């Protein structure tokens, strides 16, 4: 779809004072006029409306210069665009000069922002490319450009300047990274010096610790020798007790597992049963109710459509009746036309016969005069008598004919009066109907306008949210990138296994999700077990372990799902659930797929989540506990806690990635909402525009009807005046006829006298001759009477035809009104059919939903039956395990009694050995060893006990800085590669644009001049090269553009500009005196090419050359009177001087 400028309306803009309207057409529009008349101000109008950023673009020093002098403090310009499908778009800019100049933009009369203008133009298929406006001076600028300036021009055209800001940003990043590298290197040097000092102190402390340990080992060996004998006696009994304990624990675990599984199945069964109740009592009933409601609405709409169709049939019958009456009237008019033609033909034949008879009579009478005896006197008197007779006869006939014509005119006027009165009543009815339609349409437009701006407010709100979310995503992606760089080695190894072996599912931590509130609790409770790898089966685990061995990768823990035991039934937490600090079983706060339950249980076990460390202290001793802050309470009594940097580990990276995915889903949803609202906005805008268009059409129709009614009233008044005038004229004619009849009576007496005198004369002439004259006279009178009769009949038939034509016009108007009603009802039927289709589609969706719910009901019922079967099997296994446990406990009690006796003997030795934890037994002379160790300790002198930890901390710190240095080097390298890539991309885009323009320029120059022209790049690097223009005019040598004549330079520059226009086409072009320096040959070739292009894009050309107008589809003249510009549309006679 393409659009064009239909008209420009300016008020007090520059030299166009008051209101000026300029009309344009598609194709080539030529503007001409004397220099200084204001032609170029038309281009300034377009730039002003389109919101040019520079005041100098519209050839003004300040905004107040745009207002016509002496015209107040305000000016405005509106441009009407028309699309191929008939839509119109009016963009207006008003400038008010107050304390500060203010501009207001309007789209179709609605206040808008400048930023919305481009979107609105794009919706009409209107775009402006490079060189859409070629103003005075653009050609000379190109000719005078240096090679560097031409290159920069091509850079702007190609758009490569967009790369410059990115390249500068990357360079700034490189400088910042380099500065950070220098600072980091200085710190590394200082830390290396400190590390060497700590290394010496650490080695000294290690020697001291080794001596102390050896001394304690000697003491420990002396005690241990006393203990060994007693322990050998005890081991046998403990082994037996241990075996029994393991067997009992296994049986207890099996029983507990069966109880938990049984309870879990029972809970799942209750949940499924509840879901069945919810499904049957809630959602299915709602869907059935909604389906019934939609079916009722469909039936209602069908009834309305049937009623509308019956109305359509009635209207069609009315139209058929009007068409029949119109056809009958047309046949009668055709018959009258044939009668008029026959009567006119008969009248012309009679007039011809009358002329022939009159000529014969005159000939005979002349002979009679010639043959008279008293030639001189008799001829004179007979001629005088005859002229008087003829004159009286004609006068009488003319008076009678005038009277008859006036009576016929009066009849026509009376018929016309009746038709006008009927037409006036019809127009009054149409005006009232149109006013009602205008009110209804205006209300619709208000409704659509409110809807549009409500949607627009939502659209702006969502757009702002999208912008904010995109910023948040960018920040989150940057953080995620940093976090991803800290992914541990084992994670990358798991990724490698996933790619190498089918059946590797992933880390346990990757298969679970939980809220931010529970991060510390889950990470502490799971610990390293969260890094276990879940695989499909033990065969996959075997294959993975072999790969790790082959590649010398550290061991990993694998969890084959086919070998993992189901988690035991949940233990009864008892009274601790009533404690205010108790939160629940930790696994209940973690989300995962049920197939991975055994793997998740391996990591988290049956750990209980509590509020804080105080709650843990109250509840510790029976269950494993974890606080929200990550502190662990072991059933054996140990407490593990302290600071953890959870945010920096792999879990944090996963959560960040998860949050990022959620934000992207939210962004996608928002963008879908924005697209939907945009479609609704477009629909509302279309409805608003349609209502506005209908209102405009109705207002135009109202105006037209009012004007037509006014014309009818004036015409009726004129007819009444004509009737009165005709009545008076008829009365005057009657009076004149009466007077003439008296004169005729007198003239008849005179005629008898003349006749007697003639008879005396004729007695002396041949009687037969005068008989012929008398016969001719009688025949002439008869023909004259017949002519008058035919003329009277012709007038009557013509009057009847005029009356029938007026009746036919009235029938046509009634038919048009009826068809408009028919079209309105048809549109309503289309809308109702659309609503019916929407409801039918909605009913289908409800039916599909109902079918899906019934399927879900069947599946849930099957799950309940299966759960009942599993529960029975679990109860049987629990009873068997209890019996075995009782038997094992009896055996173990007997062994414990024996072990108690030995434990008492060893207790004193154990208390003594407890102070030597970590010591090892030695072999040799223990006394000599002790003396040697004590001397060595004295020789070491002062010891820094914190040296080992300080050394490790310093070593880790140095390693962190060295890794940071490596990352900075990698970052710098990546940034340098990015800079090179951007420069290469910029170079590619520039070279392609340069080549395309050069080829098109040569093509255009060949059409205009017949020669060749191209661009030449001077320099090895396109981005720093100089661009020259090489031209070979037809039949001339090749030279640079600077060496050409003025006209030849213009041809070359125009070729370049036209080449850019071809590559980056626009809907509309404005060319201001681009042919100024061209000779006739080149100017004509140029205008031919422009006129051909005008078939695809509207072109507005300002020119003073006469040959341009022979190619124009529209000519516009501009003249100036006392500094005020006037515009005239039309066709010129071929020269600009002819412009008004």
From Swiss-Prot:
SMART domains: SMC_hinge. ATP binds at residues 34-41. GO terms for cellular component: chromosome; cytoplasm. It is found in: Cytoplasm. InterPro entries: P-loop_NTPase (IPR027417), RecF/RecN/SMC_N (IPR003395), SMC (IPR024704), SMC_hinge (IPR010935), SMC_hinge_sf (IPR036277), SMC_prok (IPR011890). GO terms for molecular function: ATP binding; ATP hydrolysis activity; DNA binding. Residues 160-484, 660-990 form a coiled coil. SUPFAM superfamilies: P-loop containing nucleoside triphosphate hydrolases, Smc hinge domain, Tropomyosin. Belongs to the SMC family. Homodimer. Contains large globular domains required for ATP hydrolysis at each terminus and a third globular domain forming a flexible SMC hinge near the middle of the molecule. These domains are separated by coiled-coil structures. Required for chromosome condensation and partitioning. This is Chromosome partition protein Smc. It comes from Thermoplasma acidophilum (strain ATCC 25905 / DSM 1728 / JCM 9062 / NBRC 15155 / AMRC-C165). The gene is smc.
């Amino acid at each position: 779809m393409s659009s064009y400028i239909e008209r420009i309306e300016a008020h007090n803009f520059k030299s166009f004072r008051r209101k000026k309207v300029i009309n344009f057409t598609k194709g080539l529009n030529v503007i001409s006029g004397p220099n200084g008349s204001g032609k170029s101000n038309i281009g300034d109008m377009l730039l002003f409306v389109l919101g040019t950023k520079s005041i100098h673009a519209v050839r003004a020093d300040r905004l107040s210069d745009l207002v016509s002098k002496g015209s107040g403090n305000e000016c405005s310009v509106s441009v009407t665009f028309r699309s191929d499908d008939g839509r119109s778009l009016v963009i207006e800019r008003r400038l008010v000069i107050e304390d500060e100049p203010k501009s207001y933009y309007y789209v179709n009369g609605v206040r808008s922002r400048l930023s919305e203008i481009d979107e609105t133009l794009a919706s009409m298929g209107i775009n402006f490319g490079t060189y859409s406006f070629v103003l005075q001076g653009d050609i000379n600028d190109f000719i005078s450009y240096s090679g560097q300036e031409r290159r920069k021009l091509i850079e702007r055209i190609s758009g490569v300047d967009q790369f410059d800001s990115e390249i500068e940003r990357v360079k700034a990043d490189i400088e910042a990274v380099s500065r950070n590298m220098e600072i980091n290197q200085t710190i590394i040097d200082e830390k290396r010096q400190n590390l060497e000092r700590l290394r010496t102190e650490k080695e000294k402390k290690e020697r001291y610790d080794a001596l102390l340990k050896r001394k304690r080992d000697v003491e420990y060996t002396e005690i241990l020798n006393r203990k060994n004998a007693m322990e050998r006696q005890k081991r046998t009994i403990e082994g037996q007790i241990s075996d029994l304990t393991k067997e009992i624990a296994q049986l207890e675990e099996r029983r507990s597992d069966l109880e938990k599984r049984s309870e879990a199945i029972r809970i799942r069964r209750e949940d499924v049963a509840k879901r069945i109740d919810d499904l049957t009592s809630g959602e299915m009933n709602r869907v059935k109710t909604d389906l019934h409601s939609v079916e009722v609405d469909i039936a209602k709409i069908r009834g309305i459509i049937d009623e509308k169709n019956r109305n359509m049939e009635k209207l069609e019958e009315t139209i058929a009746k009007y068409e029949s009456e119109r056809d009958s009237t047309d046949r009668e008019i055709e018959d009258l036309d044939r009668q008029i033609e026959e009567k006119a033909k008969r009248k012309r034949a009679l007039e011809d016969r009358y002329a022939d008879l009159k000529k014969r009579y005159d000939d005979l009478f002349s002979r009679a005069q010639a043959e008279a005896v008293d030639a001189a006197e008799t001829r004179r008197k007979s001629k005088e008598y005859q002229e008087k007779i003829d004159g009286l006869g004609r006068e009488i006939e003319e008076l009678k004919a005038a009277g008859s014509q006036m009576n016929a005119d009066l009849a026509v006027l009376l018929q016309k009066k009746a038709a006008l009165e009927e037409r006036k009543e019809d127009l009054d009815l149409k005006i009232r109907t149109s006013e009602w339609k205008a009110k209804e349409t205006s209300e619709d437009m208000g409704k659509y306008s409110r809807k549009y701006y409500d949607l627009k407010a939502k659209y702006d709100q969502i757009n702002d949210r999208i912008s904010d979310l995109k910023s948040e995503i960018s920040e989150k992606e940057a953080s995620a990138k940093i976090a991803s760089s800290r992914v541990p080695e084992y994670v990358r190894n798991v990724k490698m296994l996933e790619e190498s072996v089918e059946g590797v599912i992933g880390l346990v931590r990757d298969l679970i999700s939980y809220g931010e509130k529970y991060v510390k609790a889950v990470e502490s409770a799971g610990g390293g077990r969260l890094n276990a790898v879940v695989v499909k089966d033990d065969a996959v685990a075997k294959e993975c372990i072999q790969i790790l061995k082959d590649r010398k990768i550290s061991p990993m823990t694998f969890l084959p799902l086919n070998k993992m035991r189901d988690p035991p039934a949940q233990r009864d937490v008892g009274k601790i659930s009533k404690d205010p600090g108790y939160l629940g079983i930790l696994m209940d706060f973690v989300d995962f797929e049920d197939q991975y339950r055994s793997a998740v249980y391996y990591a988290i076990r049956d750990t209980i989540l509590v509020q804080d460390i105080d709650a843990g202290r109250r509840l510790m001793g029976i269950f494993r506990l974890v606080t929200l802050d990550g502190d662990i309470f072991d059933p054996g009594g140990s407490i593990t806690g302290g600071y953890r940097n959870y945010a920096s580990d792999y879990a944090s990276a996963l959560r960040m990635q998860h949050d990022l995915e959620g934000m992207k889903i939210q962004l996608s949803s928002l963008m879908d909402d924005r697209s939907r609202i945009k479609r609704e906005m477009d629909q509302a805008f279309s409805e608003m525009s349609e209502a506005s268009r209908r209102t405009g059409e109705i207002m135009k129709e109202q105006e037209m009807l009012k004007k037509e009614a006014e014309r009818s009233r004036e015409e009726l008044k004129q007819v009444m005046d004509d009737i009165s005038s005709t009545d008076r004229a008829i009365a005057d004619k009657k009076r004149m006829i009466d007077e003439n009849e008296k004169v005729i009576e007198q003239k008849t007496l005179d005629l008898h006298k003349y006749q007697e005198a003639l008879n005396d004369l004729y007695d002396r002439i041949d009687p037969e001759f005068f008989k012929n004259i008398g016969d001719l006279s009688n025949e002439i009178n008869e023909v004259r009477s017949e002519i008058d009769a035919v003329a009277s009949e012709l007038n009557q038939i013509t009057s009847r035809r005029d009356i029938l034509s007026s009746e036919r016009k009235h029938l046509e108007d009634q038919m048009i009104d009826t068809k408009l009603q028919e079209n309105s009802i048809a549109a309503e039927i289309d809308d109702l059919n659309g609503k019916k289709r929407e409801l039918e589609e909605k009913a289908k969706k409800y039916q599909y939903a109902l079918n899906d719910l019934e399927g879900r009901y069947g599946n849930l019922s099957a799950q309940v039956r299966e759960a009942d079967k599993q529960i029975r099997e679990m109860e049987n296994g629990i009873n068997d395990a209890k019996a075995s446990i009782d038997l094992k406990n009896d055996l173990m009690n007997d062994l414990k009694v024996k072990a108690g006796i030995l434990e008492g003997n060893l207790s004193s030795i154990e208390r003594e050995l407890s102070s030597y934890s970590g010591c090892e037994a030695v072999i040799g002379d223990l006394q000599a060893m002790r003396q040697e160790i004590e001397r060595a300790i004295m020789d070491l002198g002062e010891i820094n006990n914190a040296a080992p930890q300080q050394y490790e901390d310093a070593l880790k710190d140095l390693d962190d800085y060295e890794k940071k240095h490596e990352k900075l080097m990698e970052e710098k390298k990546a940034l340098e590669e990015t800079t090179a890539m951007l420069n290469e991309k910029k170079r590619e885009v520039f070279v392609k644009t340069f080549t395309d323009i050069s080829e098109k320029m040569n093509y255009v120059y060949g059409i205009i001049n017949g020669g060749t022209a191209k661009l030449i790049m001077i320099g090895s690097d396109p981005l720093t090269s100089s661009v020259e223009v090489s031209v070979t005019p037809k039949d001339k040598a090749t030279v640079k553009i600077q060496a050409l004549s003025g006209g030849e330079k213009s041809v070359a520059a125009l070729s370049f500009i036209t080449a850019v226009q071809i590559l980056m086409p626009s809907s509309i072009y404005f060319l201001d005196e681009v042919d100024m320096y061209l000779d006739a040959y080149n100017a004509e070739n140029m205008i031919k090419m422009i006129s051909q292009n005008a078939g695809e894009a509207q072109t507005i050309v300002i020119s003073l050359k006469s040959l341009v107008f022979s190619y124009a589809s529209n000519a516009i003249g501009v003249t100036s009177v006392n500094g005020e510009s006037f515009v005239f549309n039309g066709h010129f006679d071929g020269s600009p001087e002819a412009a008004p």
